[in-house]
Amino acid sequence: MREYDSSSPARPCLGAIWAQTDAGIIGRDGTMPWRAPEDLAHFKTVTVGKPVIMGRRTWESFPPRFRPLPERTNIVISRSITGDSATPFERDGAFWVPSLDAALTLAGDMPLAPNATRHPDSPHQRVTAWIIGGGSVYAEALSREDLPSFGRVEIIERTFFYCQEGNEITGDTYAPELAVEEFVTAGEPARWRILGESAWEKSERGYLLDASGGKNPMYYSFQTLARL
């Protein structure tokens, strides 16, 4: 098993970050079925100063006043880009590219912003670009080990949410299933291990939206995973 070494020399390192319910839901009808201010603050702290890579639908899910995400280079993948527009171009404060490979090639060539190093003793410092959604982008990135500039995703940062039993939180988009060392069954190969996780806390201002639109008290925990 490889141990995390915070003194390792800098090199391109790709991370993926998302929030999910304990049932794996990450979205519903093109948005997220929760309000989670603590997760938004955590997301900004982890990703600020680094390129963030997303699909077009993820980009469009952000309110216009929040696009592009500040203090980060925004790279948007749009499969409809063809022909003369196949090379990266800027629009609405973001770089637009036709594929995940093009996004990673662009991100791999970018220097980190001065405000990027905020976790000198954590694996977050290793990450030089983050994938932030949506489901198909996560799935492609996590299934490959030949990603341009990076090879593969090395770090995953995920936030878990749960609410009281009996309140159903529904969705139509799910987080990737991960073979985590601490939870695989006997004989199943593990791909990830837990580097750290926070204690469960109740959100002061956040909530989960159930199937009828009701607001339910929300509990959350942050978890960091690394490749084995």
Question: What function would you assign to each model-found segment?
Answer:
Residues 2-228:
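Enzymes that bind and transform nitrogen-containing heteroaromatic metabolites
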